[in-house]
């Protein structure tokens, strides 16, 4: 097996581990209601004829907000994203409320609150409190990225051993 093939194998393993651990984190963190984000996670490894590698990861756009979080107007997180003056649309939580099985409750006066009222309350809460960072992708990427130089060095080491065996 050539050096390039070994490095390609290491890069493929890196991509698979990051995606597998990210999906696991989504499921464990109960952030996998619709499975859209889970199914959108993937990676592309491009190998040029010159031997250069390019590895890119893909996910739904809202995955960045789930991963890094969003600061609300009242609660701040260490994130580049924040709500300032525009609330998330209440209609965005319609299907989410149904999938989560949230039922309308009664208010202080005993009146039933509708699903639309519940959606508005959730949107308002997210606007004020933000979205807590889950690091479902960042954490596994960081861990595997720190291991990557060692794995690549091992791939080169194996080819060096094979080279030395051929010389003898």
Stretches found by the model and what they are:
Residues 1-46:
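Charge-rich, low-complexity N-terminal segments
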């Amino acid at each position: 097996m050539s050096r390039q093939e070994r490095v390609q194998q290491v890069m493929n393993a890196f991509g698979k581990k990051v995606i597998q651990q990210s999906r696991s984190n989504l499921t464990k963190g109960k952030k996998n209601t619709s499975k859209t984000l889970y199914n959108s996670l993937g990676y592309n490894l491009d190998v040029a004829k010159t031997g250069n590698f390019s590895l890119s990861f893909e996910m739904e756009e809202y995955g960045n907000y789930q991963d890094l979080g969003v600061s609300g107007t009242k609660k701040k997180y260490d994130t580049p994203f924040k709500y300032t003056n525009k609330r998330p649309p209440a209609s965005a939580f319609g299907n989410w409320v149904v999938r989560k099985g949230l039922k309308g409750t009664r208010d202080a006066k005993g009146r039933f609150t509708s699903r639309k009222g519940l959606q508005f309350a959730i949107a308002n809460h997210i606007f004020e409190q933000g979205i807590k960072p889950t690091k479902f992708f960042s954490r596994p990427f960081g861990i595997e990225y720190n291991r990557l130089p060692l794995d690549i060095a091992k791939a080169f080491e194996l080819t060096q051993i094979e080279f030395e065996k051929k010389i003898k």
